[in-house]
Amino acid sequence: MDRFARACLIVNAASGGNTPEACAALSDGLPAHGIVLARSVAVPDDELPTAAELDAGGIGLVAIYAGDGTLRSALTWLEGWSGAVLVLPGGTTNLLSKALHGDRPFGEILAELPRMARARRQCLRSEAGTAVIEVLAGPGAKWSDVREGLREGDVAAVASTAVEAAQASAGGSTVVLSRPEIGKPEGYSGIRLTPTSTGIEIEGYRAETIADYVAQGMALLRRDFRSGPHEELGLYRQIRLASIDGSPIELMLDGERGRGPAALRFSLAHWRSIC
């Protein structure tokens, strides 16, 4: 068990169903369990704290109440810090929080702080960055742009980006698994990588019909990947992906858009201080 005396709280009030009332309740919840709230950070307006700033303030715990994308940014920013990160369900999908704590609300999670211990968590490393939950590589990652339009309530943007995403899934540069050489030689419109304790779980998504593209797109919007048409390709300790025509690889890292070079190697690594 870890004893945390002082904490920093990172919130994104615009993430998921977060409300000012929920953020205020969380701010009160830490002191209620004997932890001094030494610093509060509201993203994206405030800058994330550095490891040196946290250490100087005697802060040993960072609690993150935000979506998966903000969580990934904070974890990447704090990589190498000796303190602990508490993951709370503050977004829409909350995949990492669910993996660690189930579907419990943050109040129940906070109540366990006096008995909570840090966990080793597998993550994925590549030249494009670190992902703690999942990676989607290929033109299918463009469906994330549609999801962003849905977040902002921009109907026109949703319509136009949905058309672009469907066209990209149908005719964009597919991605192949080159090391090891597995899966379809013509590649996939989306390859999903998930870190597990036994290896990188690999799934390939290659829709063959318009109906398949619609089904796949809806699955991507919900980040419910397994409900879309896909192939399970096995478990590997590391994997190399390459675009079939040498163009940059479109990416979705923990639900957030990115882009990598024409070839990318992903390998397992550990995050030691998540709770």
Label every PLM stretch briefly.
Residues A24-D28, E79-G80, E148-G149, M218-L221, ...:
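Short, solvent-exposed amphipathic alpha-helical segments in soluble enzyme
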Residues G204-C275:
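ATP/nucleoside-binding phosphotransfer catalytic cores, i.e., glycine-rich phosphate-binding loops
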Residues I10, S40, G80-E201, R206:
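Catalytic core of DAGKc-family lipid kinases
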Residues M1-R3, L54-G58, R125-S126, S169-G171, ...:
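Flexible, charged surface loops at secondary-structure boundaries
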Residues T19-C23, T50, A74-L75, S97, ...:
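Short, glycine/acidic-enriched capping/hinge loops at junctions between secondary-structure elements
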Residues M1-Y65, R72, T76, G80, ...:
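ATP/NTP phosphate-donor binding region
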Residues F4, I59, S82, Y188-G190, ...:
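Short, well-ordered alpha-helix to beta-strand connector turns
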Residues A66-D68, G91, A269:
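A short acidic Gly-Thr/Ser loop motif
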